[in-house]
Design a protein with these regions (language model features):
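Mid-chain, well-packed structural core segment of small domains
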Residues: 78-109
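Beta-strand elements of well-folded, non-transmembrane domains
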Residues: 21-25, 40, 72-76, 115-117, ...
Length: 144
């Protein structure tokens, strides 16, 4: 039986994940928070909803900005990693692997997903500004 090559997703374990995004004055803060929580498995959302840190700041032109940040460590971080791997489409997983050299630094994997799609409970890699930033700290096996 032919052995399948290992990929980033199958050969790595996440020990920590940091999710962050911002809500501008024109955005509904509740929807932005929902989008952030939609990134994690449904079974963990209630547990971590109260752990989201909120920071209010001002933009360059004095516009109010709310920054949301959630840090998860341990086994739940790996559960989130696997959930995201399964939730991304095959094309997005391949794109991440093909751009790995610009996404991986010192065992940290950087991914940006569309905030709009996350609100709709779909994950899509997005390189624009309206994103949820995801930073995984990985412990990796060997990738073929």
């Amino acid at each position: 039986m032919e052995e399948r090559p290992k990929t980033l997703w199958s050969s790595s374990t996440a020990t920590r994940v940091e999710l962050s995004c911002s809500a501008h004055a024109t955005e509904d803060e509740g929807k932005v928070l929902t989008a952030l929580l939609n990134i994690i498995p449904e079974s963990l959302r209630e547990q971590y909803a109260s752990a989201v840190e909120t920071t209010r700041t001002m933009g360059y032109h004095g516009n109010p900005i709310t920054i949301y940040r959630l840090v998860v460590e341990g086994p739940d971080a790996n559960e989130i990693f696997k959930h995201i791997a399964l939730s991304l489409g095959e094309e997005d997983r391949k794109y991440i692997e093909s751009t790995l050299s610009s996404r991986l630094e010192r065992c940290r994997l950087y991914i940006r997903v569309s905030k709009q799609w996350a609100y709709l409970r779909r994950l899509k890699v997005y390189e624009g500004d309206d994103v949820i930033r995801i930073v995984f700290t990985l412990r990796r096996g060997r990738v073929a």
